[in-house]
Amino acid sequence: GCDRILRTWKASGKRLMVGFNMRYMNIFRVMKEIIDTGTIGELKAAWCRHFVGHGRTFYFQDWHATRQGSNTLLLQKGSHDIDMIHWLTGQYSKRVAAFGGLDMFGGDKPNDLRCPDCAEADTCWEVADPSCSRNQCCFRQEVDVEDNNVMIMELDGGIKASYLQCHFTPDYHRNYTIIGTEGRVENSEPEGKVWVKMRRANTWKELADRTYEIRPAMGGHGGADPVITEDFLDMVLDGKEPLATPLAGRMSVAAGCAGADSLRSGGQVQEVPEVAW
């Protein structure tokens, strides 16, 4: 499907943009600048831990909870994180392997059961907020999308990457660590900080040698929405290439789908297919 979109885009001669809003968040733009200036040397490893504290509400109480509806949360949720790994390192995934399972949600409840009608609503920890329209029972029988995933990736250039995604954590944030030959850079979303640790600093007991304080930005998605809107207008009005290209979107989707194929085949290594232009 993505390749058909790319071919149509090329044939049309029109402009196309992918809305990867995380590329526009200040905390990740700072990380990208640190990496691109060579501070941590030649990149060798990239790790992402995604604590999806609202996974039940966002993905298991509506259509996302079935493979027929969403295929995999390595795609529906993970495409942003996979893209960030690609963007921060400047390399795409070549092959992946993954393990995952349905470790919290799903069960034996009727598929048509909704939280407002459930006899256990007063005692269920996963009951939907009364104001939320996503209120299907997250323990219903049809739920078959994995809620706990681990994926490893080999990127172009030999970079090794890992992506961990859990949808029943008590907190909600992302943690990225990028490691190079001279040091590493890591972010803390809850604290609004980026840490840099250098190999030659001889301060191995300390968390960081440099700490960047990230100022809160106005606008949705951590201040990304106004910036991505401006980037879109620059593309439409002036022909400027957007920060996230259609190819970037396709490569993130392809890696996520390959990860799902792997975890559903016992963790077999899957090659990420090349674009069929």
What function would you assign to each model-found segment?
Residues 46, 97-99, 162-165, 188:
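Beta-strand scaffold of nucleotide-dependent catalytic cores
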